[in-house]
Amino acid sequence: MNITFIFILIFGFFNTQKCSKDYDHFDDEDLALSIPKNAIGVPKEFRQQVLKEMKLRNRPNDILKNRCYCNYDQSICGNNMTCVKQDGAACYHAVEEVYNKAEKRMETLHKWGCATLERGSGASHLTCNSWRAAHHSPKSIGCCYEGNYCNKNLIPPAYVHHHKEKALQEKTDNPEDYDSPLENMTRGGKMFIMVFATVMSVFAVIGCIYLCITRAEEKSKARARAKTVSLKTESTYMESKSMLEDSGSGSGQAALIQRTVRQDLTIIKTIGQGRYGEVRKALYRGSYVAVKTFYTTDEDSWKNERDVYQTNMINHENILQFVAADIWSEEDSMTKMLLITDYHELGSLSDYLCREETLTTDEALRLIHSCICGIEHLHAAVHGTGSFRKPEIAHRDIKSKNIIVKRPNVCCIADLGLALRYQNDKILPEKFNVQVGTKRYMAPELISNKLNPKDFSQFKMADIYSMALVMWEVAIRVEVNTCEEVLTVDETSPDHSASSGIGESVSSSGNISRMHLQKTNVEGHSTSLKAKQHVPPFDGIVHNDPNFDEMNDVICVRRIRPPPDLAWKNVPALNELSKLMEDSWHSIPHFRHSALKLKKEMAELIKNPDRQNQSQRKVEFQQQDSGLVESATNQS
């Protein structure tokens, strides 16, 4: 280590001597002006690059507007004393008072050229404002952006913080003070700088090595912990086996967050088009994914959806699984933002309902139940171990096109670009528009702009209204071709009297024999429900793209809702479902069911779809039994 340190010191000392000998005073003039070295223009490469960029941007007529007058040598300015600036950059005219040692007098040095285009500002502000600072010798610079040799007759501003007469006297009396700064440095000062720089470099290298070793150890420990957890939990093993086979659930963040994901994507085809961009099917490391593309004008929506997907404990069976987010520049030089999720072949719920195949009652109930489970998970605040906590989330754009069918009878909620989070007693993002979403599915309080944005529960109730319309879309695709089971009395039973229903119903032992019931298919009681073609809510009532005034008249003033099918009353499950719809799209938000209430009701309806008939039969049995007992008592 000591030998290496001494070698570095010796090498630095000789390198300093070489720099001192080769120092060029003309370069010092440019550096003192704070003009970047490539501001003057690079002879051929720079001109070719600018011309190439202009051709790519289809603006060949702008070349004349980018030409500046240049008085440097031919290698920089070319044959016609011209340099070409970038779009947005400036042409400059710089002046400096230089002391002529041979003639012992001050001379004004003029320089014309092209300034560089600074990153971030889209102009040449730093170069053009360098005259405002004090310099070792009088300097100034003037800029113009019009091009077309606008700097040729440009007059720079007056010198700042320096008087010409005083500068001339100082240079005449003490010309050695205006030599190169490196020449005025003592040999001891140079050595001190070299030693200090070398020592700091050594410490920096040691620090970097230490950080690399520490991070490697932390990653190794993290992998070991993850491996231990995967051996203990079967769900984690299934998730690692196939990331795209099942969305799974968990308390961590989403699967991948990388800036290099696009390089591993192989785009296959376009599968959809939305208001923010397009959705394409792609292959990512051997698995199919859906790539949602956002344009730069919708960057806020991309950031919000990415942040929602990265929320702790967001993973759920009925929430579309997030894979990664990335920013990429396509071949057309347009920057696009990518959001990558699981790909599901069945597509959206709207596409699924448009198929020729109809739904059974059980299929419809399970599709609706899975959607409500996803919404309930979004609406609920989940507290995990430690600091893990999932905030309440309102979707704000529930519709059949934003619901994906993962597999038969199972849906998941997608498109969280407009979602809001209620975290730490405040709504995120802090700046948002209240009246957003699809107008056809918007709740009355949103259409009439009466929703209180400070009450987060009202956003969740608006989701319930939208979900009720989706429930109606699913229900109209149900087709039932069965005969209803009707309770009748067996008139041939010896224990039954045709006139009163009592007769010889009491045996000699005093026991009451129950009325004989049988299931028969009675003409006029058959249930035949034909499925209707899938249409969006309020189809035929409003236009394809209704405005707020039209929707306000329909759902707020006239209070129109999608009509239920009259045949639903003959199907117990659909009859109960229609009641849930009516409660959920109520005009008053607080009268609607919560997502948790709907989730429980749908689970019970799936478990017991004939509960309405059974409850009616139970009442009939109780009435019949009470009538028999009363008759028997009177006879006795």
From Swiss-Prot:
Biased composition annotated in UniProt, kind: Low complexity: 497-510
Residue ranges with Polar residues bias: 611-636
Source superkingdom: Eukaryota
Binding site for ATP: I271, G272, Q273, G274, R275, Y276, G277, E278, V279, K292
A GO molecular function held by the record: protein serine/threonine kinase activity
SUPFAM superfamilies recorded: Protein kinase-like (PK-like), Snake toxin-like
Compartments it resides in: Membrane
GO biological process: activin receptor signaling pathway; BMP signaling pathway; cellular response to growth factor stimulus; dauer larval development; defense response to fungus; defense response to Gram-positive bacterium; innate immune response; maintenance of protein location in nucleus
Residues exposed to the Extracellular side: 21-190
Topology term for the membrane: Single-pass type I membrane protein
Residue ranges that the UniProt entry lists as topological domain Cytoplasmic: 212-636
Domain Protein kinase: 265-606
Active-site feature positions: D397 (proton acceptor)
EC number: 2.7.11.30
Signal peptide as annotated in the record: 1-20
Residues that carry a glycan: N80, N184
Catalytic activity: L-threonyl-[receptor-protein] + ATP = O-phospho-L-threonyl-[receptor-protein] + ADP + H(+); L-seryl-[receptor-protein] + ATP = O-phospho-L-seryl-[receptor-protein] + ADP + H(+)
Region feature Disordered, mapped onto this chain: 491-510, 608-636
PROSITE patterns linked: GS, PROTEIN_KINASE_ATP, PROTEIN_KINASE_DOM, PROTEIN_KINASE_ST
The keyword ATP-binding is assigned to this record: yes
Residue span(s) of domain GS: 235-264
Function in brief: Serine/threonine-protein kinase receptor which binds TGF-beta-like ligands dbl-1 and perhaps daf-7. Upon ligand binding, probably activates a TGF-beta-like signaling pathway.
Family note: Belongs to the protein kinase superfamily. TKL Ser/Thr protein kinase family. TGFB receptor subfamily.
Subunit structure: Interacts with sma-10. Interacts with drag-1.
UniProt protein name: Serine/threonine-protein kinase receptor sma-6
